[in-house]
Structure formats: C-alpha cells, structure tokens
Amino acid sequence: MKENIESKNIGNRKFIIELRYEPKVTMLDSKGALVEKIQETRVFPCTHWEIGQSEVVIRDDKKKEDAHNVVLVTLNRMSFISYKVDSVESFYASFSKVYEAVTKVLSSLTITRIGCRIIGTYNTKSNDLRMFLRTFKIRFLLNFY
C-alpha cells in the first residue's frame, strides 16, 4: 500500500477500516478471548475495554472522547479507528494484526463488505467559500490526480 497522502497535507486525521461479515454467533461466547487476543497484538496500549451484549470495544483511553485508537467487534462487523496515524502503511499493518487476532478467535469470516475512510481537517486562510474551493482544488486535488 503506497503512502499517497503526505502527513503535512492533513491535520487531525481519522482513519477507519470497517469489515462487514456474515454473523458469527460464536462471538457471543468468545468476547473475553477477543479482548485478550487483541490486547496481545500491542498495536496500541489497551487501557480500557468494554464487553456488551453483542460487542467488544477496546480503546486506548477510558474516556471515549480522549481515545485515539478504537477497535469494535460485533456479531457481523469489525471496525478499527485511529486518530493517531503516522502513515497509511503503519495503519494498515496495525489493522492487519487486529484482523488476524479476531480471526484466530472467530475462525474464518465470510466478508460481505469492506470500507475505508480517511477524514481530515484542513486549515484555511479565507472566509470566502469560492476562494477556499479554488485553493483546495489547487493544493489538494491536483496533487493526487
């Protein structure tokens, strides 16, 4: 996976990879094992985890709003979210470790959908929307196409 967005171009990045798969009912009996296996990956310091009726949430802070890394596993979905990304490669490597841990516990998954989002904020020097769009087009879009 090529690093196609330089860190200097994006501030406050949020990366999300989400897998949807056919429901794995065995997940209900394996929630504790999921937490342990994901913690063993050491992709981030797991300081807080929650086990709900049909989900496991692991994050690097007790307060949801202060967390930089979050893993969510449900009956039919796995999400890996990070606000602290050094590169696309490092994010994908961390996701791969978490995915491997999940499949060790739940065995094979029949994936029905995969999605990836990168959300970022951009500093502006003008309040004028037309000026902003022109600048955005010049600085951002033309650099990647």
Residue ranges, per PLM feature:
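Aromatic/basic-lined ligand-recognition segments
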Residues: 1-5, 113-145
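Generic ordered-secondary-structure signal
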Residues: 10-12, 74-77, 96-98, 121-125, ...
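Charged/polar, solvent-exposed surface patches and flexible loops
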Residues: 33-40, 93, 97, 104, ...
